[in-house]
């Protein structure tokens, strides 16, 4: 069969994760996936983030040897010098995305993304308070797609390009090809 890659944005990432259960992947493996802005109920994303390598932040986790799954944000963090396995999965997420980092646990527990090094787009003035931070991030949910591209739940084309190149590893593709493709999208007006 032809190569099969999965894609999901937001709730699509949640559904896409569920469609690629482990048994199915073993029986008839996909080649990879790009999941962007995974919402907080995403079980696979939550498990990987919870079990990330020590020292890697929850907003940009490293998982095991990075051969099967990698995370990226505003800056390309896919570390293409590391060896990939036969299945390549990339999560695109921004630390300022309330869809990804909201949690009912915010009611009474300080989240990992506010402990230690913060994401580049999380205000240093954001302080966790029981109940209050839960409400603040909860109120951000309906506005998650209103920030400019590259912030919140507004994923930029450049980040998609980096992710798809990492996942598909197109033969003969060069850094110049990537730069040209990114420029093509940068020259287009934003959607909406």
Segments and roles (model prediction):
Residues 1-2, 21-192:
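C-terminal His-loop and adjacent cap/lid subdomain of alpha/beta-hydrolase
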Residues 13-19:
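Hydrolases whose catalytic domains are alpha/beta-hydrolase-1, hotdog thioesterase
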């Amino acid at each position: 069969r032809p190569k099969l890659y999965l894609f999901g944005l937001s709730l699509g990432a949640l559904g896409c994760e569920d469609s690629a259960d482990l048994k199915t992947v073993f029986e008839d493996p996909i080649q990879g996936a790009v999941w962007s802005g995974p919402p907080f109920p995403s079980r696979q994303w939550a498990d990987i983030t919870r079990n990330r390598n020590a020292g890697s932040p929850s907003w940009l986790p490293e998982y095991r040897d990075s051969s099967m799954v990698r995370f990226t944000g505003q800056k390309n963090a896919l570390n293409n010098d590391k060896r990939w396995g036969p299945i390549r999965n990339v999560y695109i997420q921004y630390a300022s995305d309330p869809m990804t980092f909201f949690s009912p646990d915010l009611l009474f527990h300080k989240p990992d993304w506010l402990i230690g090094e913060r994401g580049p787009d999380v205000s240093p003035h954001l302080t966790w308070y029981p109940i209050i931070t839960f409400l603040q991030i909860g109120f951000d949910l309906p506005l998650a797609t209103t920030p400019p591209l590259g912030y919140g739940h507004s994923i930029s084309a450049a980040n998609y390009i980096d992710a798809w190149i990492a996942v598909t590893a197109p033969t003969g593709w060069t850094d110049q090809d990537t730069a040209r493709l990114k420029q093509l999208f940068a020259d287009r007006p934003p959607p909406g």
